[in-house]
Amino acid sequence: MKYDHQSIETRWQKKWEDSGIFQCDTEADKPKYYVLEMFPYPSGNIHMGHVRNYSIGDVVARFKRMQGFNVLHPMGWDAFGLPAENAAIKNGTHPAKWTFANIDNMRSQLKRLGYSYDWQREVATCTPEYYRWEQLFFLRFLEKGLVYRKKAAQNWCPKCHTVLANEQVIEGLCWRCDSAVEQKELTQWFLRITDYAEELLADLSKLENGWPERVLSMQRNWIGKSTGAEIRFALDGRDDSITVFTTRPDTIFGATFMSIAPEHPLVEELIDGKPQADDVRAFVERIRNMDRIDRQSDTLEKEGVFTGAYCVNPFTGRKMPIWVANFVLAEYGTGAVMAVPAHDQRDFEFARKYDLPMQVVIQPQGETLDPATMSAAWTEAGALVNSGNFDGLANEDAKQRIADDLETTGNGRRTINYRLRDWNISRQRYWGAPIPVIYCDACGVVPEKEENLPVVLPLDVKTHDDGRSPLPHTPAFYECTCPVCGGKARRETDTMDTFVESSWYFARYTDATNDKAPFTPDALRYWLPVDQYIGGVEHAILHLLYSRFFTKALRDCGFIELDEPFANLLTQGMVLMDGSKMSKSKGNVVDPTEMIARYGADTVRLFCLFAAPPERDFDWSESGIEGSYRFVGRVWRLVEELREHLLAVGACSSTAEDAKTPVARELRLKEHATVRKAGDDLNDRFQFNTAIAAVMELVNALYLAKDELVADESGRKVLSSAVSTVLTLLSPFTPHLSEELWALLGHTESVSTLPWPRWKEDALVRDTVTLVVQVNGKLRGKLDIPADASREEVETLALNEPNVLRYLEGVTVRKVVVIPGKLVNVVVS
């Protein structure tokens, strides 16, 4: 019978769906395991990256079920956002119609791959049933002061017609469309993620055993904790002051000028009436539209312009010119920097360029620095000089002493600064969750009443070809009454950043059909945290950081009782073609649907899992998938050939008594060694490729042993046990093949419901060993002897081996060398 993957796979997929075999419920008396892959944006078609990601998750889910866990393995759709809206506009259709059609198609594709999802828990973030709870969270965050509204310069994508969070600007470009990002003054809604900066940083230690160090490091760097001091510098000739943040208070005596960001709120006041005003304004306008990442680059050419204003160094009393500089960012620290050119490289380059004064205040041991001859700033340790009462102190000690002085005199204070900025969630686009606030001329900003949720996104609107939102031009949506005074009011027409939806979806899966609450405490308590999360490393400082923040904020609002959402994280590698990332523009895309039609879902899954360890990239290759296809066929033919013999003995687990011959004993040993190897690889390391390789070796051993073992019943029992083990071990990887062959062997239960095989210690002990026998170093025979034979017994058996005896005639045996478990060498003369 030919292996017809098309009919076999679709038949088993229907059986699984009809039986609800992968649906799960909260079972307090059973250990749980929650495995989750990052849900996709419904683009219309899955790609090979999806296949690899979801195949990894499915192996984990199936393996954990076989280990006895109650497994939650859900799937849904990250369905709001710019990509869907832009694609729908491009194709002349409504985003809702486009999105739901794509969801239907992708759901079918995922089912065709045989993934063991609990489809009853499916969510789509663009449905009111989902985002109503998100709007509830917004209102509770607003109550708690975790949401606020402010006007500020924002990252603006001119092509997408919306703002971007700092994390969504990659090297000055929009993360979605690669357009150059501009700065634009807008009033926006923000989430206070900075309130959790220290906890987000500290709790990374809880994830050290479960998350890749690379991701932890990326989050540490993004949060960017700096310990230092704020120092106030009086403005010369004014009753005002300017505050700086510095990590180097020990260098305060070396501060010779001040650098401030072009966006600093004091710029206009400082230049008012000064002859430099026009030059400063032109410089500010030019620099504000530069990429902020570029402005932080070490290779950036340092530029600045003098404001005409001065401040006063609180320790030296020296007047310091105030410059606007391109490398100072308003959002870091206070947007002002005390410039110490002798001990900071950026300040050094700036001072050299504009001929500004330089004062050495830290001398290295055994060396005297001279500003006139220095080729670079001295940024290492040393002793303070030219620093008044602090001369001679080691600079680390001086940091504390000078900070003490600042706090005593009131000129400053110790503080901690973070690179992390609050999360701007306002988007000026249509396809997103409405922000549930109302603007009333009499009452101001008013939250929508919870009983009025959801604020439904209207579907009967016409989107604009240029991407502008139709909501500000849709009176039926924005015209409303104030919940406080009942007067005429206007609804917010911005929508939420789509990363808000993906920041809590993992919690909704625990109780996805609940229409009274986002989830119940019992469901959350049982299922969370996610035991294994799987997705790309590109989400390290976007989705993963936002989800951690959201979990903590929901905890503080009484929704959740845990600190971290994901106990373990696996970041899978990419699927490449000829060393490059697959993309339509490069024309190097492999269509999963085409591969499934040609080779079958099991083969596609198997190749994606066998090609490389999950965290590494791998190159797609026709020879590789052909090899996986041949292996699937080889397993099919093996069982088909042995079927009648195996049906005769029935299902069995062979015993030591069944393994009567060396071949039988060797196959039984191989079977149990494979169970141990595959289990260890899946359980501890997720090394799917080596687990598959071990099963392949067992299949090879079966082919070598089958002809001898089918001859008697005990041998057939050993064969039956090994074949059953192969099908069971393969079922997480090639579930359709395993189900079909299991059924062909007369079993009525699903192989997916079987327990993971157990290996036996006694089966891994060889009771005989094979030794080679040499005479004067040349191979003359082989011995199969008991593993526990004594040295004397080994010598006797070797000297009496028939072939060896021929070489001992007429010679004298001088000595016998025995290397246990390997060889015997008879030395003669």
Swiss-Prot record:
It is found in: Cytoplasm. GO terms for biological process: leucyl-tRNA aminoacylation. ATP binds at residue 584. A motif ('HIGH' region) lies at residues 40-50. Keywords: Aminoacyl-tRNA synthetase, ATP-binding, Cytoplasm, Ligase, Nucleotide-binding, Protein biosynthesis. Gene3D superfamilies: 3.10.20.590, HUPs, Isoleucyl-tRNA Synthetase, Domain 1. One of its GO terms (cellular component) is cytosol. PROSITE patterns: AA_TRNA_LIGASE_I (PS00178). InterPro entries: aa-tRNA-synth_I_CS, aa-tRNA-synth_Ia, Leu-tRNA-ligase, Leu_tRNA-synth_edit, M/V/L/I-tRNA-synth_anticd-bd, Methionyl/Leucyl_tRNA_Synth, Rossmann-like_a/b/a_fold, tRNAsynth_Ia_anticodon-bd. A motif ('KMSKS' region) lies at residues 581-585. It catalyses: tRNA(Leu) + L-leucine + ATP = L-leucyl-tRNA(Leu) + AMP + diphosphate. Its main location: cytoplasm. GO terms for molecular function: aminoacyl-tRNA deacylase activity; ATP binding; leucine-tRNA ligase activity. Its EC number is 6.1.1.4. Belongs to the class-I aminoacyl-tRNA synthetase family. This is Leucine--tRNA ligase. It comes from Nitratidesulfovibrio vulgaris (strain DP4).
